[in-house]
Amino acid sequence: MALLQIAEPGQSAAPHQHRLAVGIDLGTTNSLVAAVRSAQALTLPDEQGRHSLPSVVHYGETNVLVGYEAQDKSALDPQNTIVSVKRFMGRSLTDIQSGVHRLPYELHASENGLPVFTTPMGQVNPIQVSAEILKPLIARAETTLGGELAGVVITVPAYFDDAQRQGTKDAAELLGVKVLRLLNEPTAAAIAYGLDSKQEGVIAIYDLGGGTFDISVLRLNRGVFEVLATGGDSALGGDDFDHLLVSHLQQAWQITEPGSQLARQLLIEARRVKEALTDNDSVEASVVMADKTLTCTVDKSLFNELIGALVKKTIGCCRRTLRDAGVSVDDVIETVMVGGSTRVPLVREQVETFFKKTPLTSIDPDRVVAIGAAIQADILVGNKPESDLLLLDVIPLSLGVETMGGLVEKVVTRNTTIPVARAQEFTTFKDGQTAMAFHVVQGERELVEDCRSLARFTLHGIPPLAAGAAHIRVTFQVDADGLLSVTAMEKSTGVNTSIQVKPSFGLSDTEIATMLKDSMKYAKDDITRRMLAEQKVEAARVIESLNAALAKDAALLDEQEREELVVAIAQLDAVAQQDNIDAIEKAIANLDDKTQDFASRRMDNSIRAALKGQSVDNI
């Protein structure tokens, strides 16, 4: 799948077709689907106008219910109503064994150790359950958008490992849906606010949902999001606020043991009061019990007192996660609020106080992750205008490193499909060289000065060997997101260093086309300049090598011979300063001819030294 219609300069690409793609927030409690429509990313509602879908699946004797219908079955048939299946994704039964006794499901281990739920419709695994949640979201999207989807971007927690990510991808592929990308939830939130277009800085994503709290610290550098650290509490969320309020109401109304119906009524009323306190200083709570209406006024200060310890606990998680990330509060340039529970005024106040800046809240915190995923999906199917962020499934311009003389050695050539890995070996230029500087460049020209600089780094710890003896393996890896990792490793010691960069950052289609046209326009001139630079590098290498040899073995020559070599070296050095390829080549050949006898004597001398004290038998 090519994400950008690429044509050679002067040729037109195929007419652009709008492709349908969506972003899906596959949540623990609720899930959403979003799409870019008329250049605006929006979540898509169902026929009843509801945007979120409860992540709940009920297996009956003959049918499967998903969402609100399944949620209604949770009290009546908890054993066959699966909630929070995301917690089981990619985990073995052993991983979750400690919590099994508290779960109403009948769980068994499959042949590969993964958990399976026993239901009236047979055994199902977490991947199949997740696919049931995705199914109505996909159907909603195709109905709303009026066509088949070209692909989806699904969000996952930043801390998900490979098994959990693969399980999420498999759930979509069970439905025959192409997964364009799995996107970290905090990264999706940052994209929704357009933070990916900023140059650099640290971003905190504060995610307080119904059942969990997550804090993620990201570093943004030239369009690349790096997750520095994640933290949180998997058993702390807005539901805990509700339960504290329920306990208060029970105490106020002297209700000791409510039945299931009253307990549900209390919980619904607690949620209503919590939400109403977002915009009101006080709210009257009421429930009907035994034909009697109980009322109680709850003000904001009382509610804050009830939940204060829990909010403080989330701030403690933030403090620890910043410490794990190795950054301070002052390093954080933006704070993004995710999750419906971040609407609570006390939460926003505490977050603002801790991070010393007003958090970003203009996008609905329940929908922000899905919206970010939709923006990414729109880019990945090629619907983004060329002036916007560029994401490709091919390398648009060659990637390489600078070599001696300002030359470019291409490691990954343009139009190579990604993901890709390429490696090449380089060596040292001077005797005793213990470090090597690398300059990563992008472009089609032969000289570094005509290419785009991407990054620089240095490999230290190279063994001090003769020039050309050390072997440094340089590996270029470009992942599916277009992120380039360059690693340099000295083969004998294993010492290595690496750097990451996004080659597409700040690069438009127009700039790519211009660079390609220039490479063709100046091709002949570039080859000539490259040949000249190569001859100059070779001249410098020969001079360097011969000077080292004279310093070590000058005694092997008489005075006249030494003088002739010194003159020849000076002549080559002078010619190398000029821009005459043939003259430099002749001067190198002349010096090579004059050093033949010297080289033979050095070889004989080395052999004698090696054989000294050795018997014929040993040899």
Swiss-Prot record:
Chaperone as UniProt keyword: yes
GO process annotations (BP): iron-sulfur cluster assembly
SUPFAM superfamilies in the record: Actin-like ATPase domain, Heat shock protein 70kD (HSP70), C-terminal subdomain, Heat shock protein 70kD (HSP70), peptide-binding domain
Keywords tagged on the record: ATP-binding, Chaperone, Nucleotide-binding
Pfam hit, one: HSP70
GO molecular function: ATP binding; ATP hydrolysis activity; ATP-dependent protein folding chaperone; unfolded protein binding
Record-linked InterPro entries: ATPase_NBD (IPR043129), Heat_shock_70_CS (IPR018181), HscA_NBD (IPR042039), HSP70_C_sf (IPR029048), HSP70_peptide-bd_sf (IPR029047), Hsp_70_fam (IPR013126), ISC_FeS_clus_asmbl_HscA (IPR010236)
Gene3D superfamilies found in the cross-reference section: 1.20.1270.10, 3.30.420.40, Actin, Chain A, domain 4 (3.90.640.10), Substrate Binding Domain Of DNAk, Chain A, domain 1 (2.60.34.10)
Family of the protein in this entry: Belongs to the heat shock protein 70 family.
Function: Chaperone involved in the maturation of iron-sulfur cluster-containing proteins. Has a low intrinsic ATPase activity which is markedly stimulated by HscB.
Name of this protein: Chaperone protein HscA homolog
